[in-house]
Amino acid sequence: MCIRDRQWRGRWDTIQTISAWLVPVLLGVAFGNLVAGMKIIVADPKTPFVEVGPENVDIANAGMSQIHSFIGLGEFPFSQLLSLLIGGSGFAILGGLVIASLSLVQGANFLALKTDGAVQERAVAIAPKLGLISTILTAVFAVWGTFAFKGDGFLFALIFLVLAAVCLIVSLLFAFKGASAKAFTFNSIAIAMAVAWVFAMLFPNVMKSSIDPAYSLTIAQSSASAGTQIVMTVAAIILVPIVLGYTIWSVYMFRARISVAPAGGLEPDKIREGANFLVG
């Protein structure tokens, strides 16, 4: 099997396309479920199918209990992860569409920055259209989530919501002007603010229960021990600069634009014309 085999290429193109769509959609669904809350209960590990009453749940005994997803999976392996992804609602599904649309806009702006010729023209043309759809979907999702599922972090969530909205609008305006670099920058900031909004909505929890607030998993309950936090902090101090360093270096090394023009040393039989975005 090689790149010359059409069936082999087609099979992997299909797999790559499906995977590329599934990742942002499922990530958005997970975020939506986290914000809205999941159908989880706290059960005593000695009798895992017997619910602990909300009045009996506190930090002291929660450490001896288990959080169960309540979607009929029981003790099925990875049931909590599955409930996060498939125990969805209309809000969670909208979250999947939002993340997918934001990813499309980000990709279009990035293509406009990294390509030349016809490819760049197509990316510049499609970016504002995708940006308009993305902005509308994000606005509905964020306003719905902020006011329907507000908690203790409402004020911070509102601040991040406003910042994300401003950045999305500015990004959209730059996209319509063809200023791809500025559009990409502000869309990136908007995505960062959106992530901050999600965790502000969760505060002071890391996982909310839609059945009863007493069943929610709080930051205090899920935090690591002091020793573990020290190890993690030291590791972060050492590794984060390294990661940032090689990321900046790789971006700098690959700063040139990609063109469909023939490149010296590239074997002609490795180019597949007429079957990808580069040639339409």
Feature locations, PLM:
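Conserved small/polar residues in nucleotide/adenosyl-binding loops
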Residues: M1-D5
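Long, contiguous internal "core" modules enriched in hydrophobic/ aromatic residues
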Residues: R6-K182, W197
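...captures the hydrophobic TM-helix bundle architecture rather than a specific catalytic motif
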Residues: Q16-N33, N187-A194, L239-T247, V251
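Peri-membrane helix termini and adjoining interfacial loops of integral membrane proteins
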Residues: P45-T47, F70-I71, M207-L217
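Divalent metal-coordination and catalytic microenvironments
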Residues: Q106, L202, S250
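Membrane-interface capping segments at transmembrane-helix boundaries
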Residues: F174-A181, G245-A261
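Short, highly charged, low-complexity non-transmembrane loops/tails of multi-pass membrane proteins
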Residues: A190, A256-N276
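Short, membrane-exposed interhelical loops at transmembrane-helix boundaries
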Residues: S209-V231
